[in-house]
Swiss-Prot record:
Pfam name, any one: DUF2463
Taxonomic superkingdom: Eukaryota
Region called Disordered, residue ranges: 1-24
Name under which the protein is recorded: UPF0328 protein ECU08_2080
Family assignment from sequence similarity: Belongs to the UPF0328 family.
InterPro entries: UPF0328
Length: 276
């Protein structure tokens, strides 16, 4: 009986250990550089304050330093989120859920493609005014980095448990990030570009605070089904991210229409800036 009891205890302990084991690490931050989201905002804002504003058109390399880091972070982070749930493609689910997850995956890949397109668009246009320099080197990095950072560090995209995952102080940090995104879009429509550097610096502080919090916290485990308010918070973050990225896409199309005769042109817009 002793041998049987030992075998039974071993069999019952194994599933418990498997349940308690952490899930595969989420692709929140690139392992090669944990400060990648921080530097993706810090380098562009340095480009705003250090060179003379007229030097950007004379030296395209300065444009690239300001545009490439946030676009590259966003372009890489969303495919990592897409690839981070291998079970999402093999778990059978109802047609409605399968369609929603398909739209989610398609949106992540679209965000990545828009980020790559932004590199070509915003380095092609002329930075011939203080407003354009402020938009490209302060507002645009915040709009690109904050959604990718929120979705990768504060949300679970695992099928069946999708939702907002942060708690305690992290919720306040996330709320401030969402507020900065909304403020950036609102101030841009009002053409209040002089406030863009403050939004960028605030984003820099919040991203650093979030990185420090995540580096000292325990790894995330497999989340349980999220309550309704966490799902609503995720929908808010994802919906705002969609609005941000498709606004950027619209501006990219406007830039290409103004600079390339073969590209379908459109009327000027005030979504990000009306100086192109």
């Amino acid at each position: 009986m002793g041998i049987i009891d030992v075998q039974r205890s071993h069999l019952t302990a194994t599933p418990s250990k498997e349940r308690d084991a952490p899930a595969h690490p989420p692709p929140t931050i690139l392992p090669v550089c944990i400060l990648f989201p921080y530097t993706s905002i810090a380098l562009p804002v340095l480009m705003y304050y250090i060179p003379e504003k007229g030097q950007f058109d004379q030296n395209p390399f300065l444009k690239l330093i300001a545009i490439l880091p946030p676009c590259l972070y966003s372009a890489v982070q969303f495919p990592l989120l897409f690839l981070g749930n291998p079970e999402s493609s093999c778990t059978p689910r109802p047609a409605l859920y399968a369609t929603l997850y398909l739209l989610l995956d398609a949106s992540l890949l679209a965000f990545s493609a828009i980020s790559i397109l932004s590199i070509a668009a915003f380095t092609t246009t002329e930075w011939n005014s203080d407003e354009v320099v402020a938009v490209c080197s302060t507002l645009l990095p915040s709009l690109l980095v904050l959604p990718a950072h929120l979705l990768s560090t504060s949300c679970a995209l695992t099928p069946g448990s999708i939702g907002f995952t942060d708690s305690s102080v992290d919720i306040l940090i996330d709320l401030l990030m969402v507020s900065l995104l909304a403020a950036g879009l609102t101030l841009n429509v009002d053409e209040s570009w002089r406030f863009f550097p403050y939004i960028c610096i605030s984003s820099l502080v919040l991203v650093l605070a979030k990185l420090l919090r995540k580096s000292s916290s325990m790894p995330r485990r497999d989340p349980a089904p999220a309550p309704a308010w966490r799902i609503a918070a995720f929908v808010l973050i994802f919906g705002l991210s969609m609005f941000v990225y498709f606004s950027i896409l619209h501006e990219c199309l406007l830039i290409f229409g103004n600079h390339f005769p073969w590209f379908p042109s459109q009327a000027p817009s005030n979504d990000l800036t009306n100086k192109w």
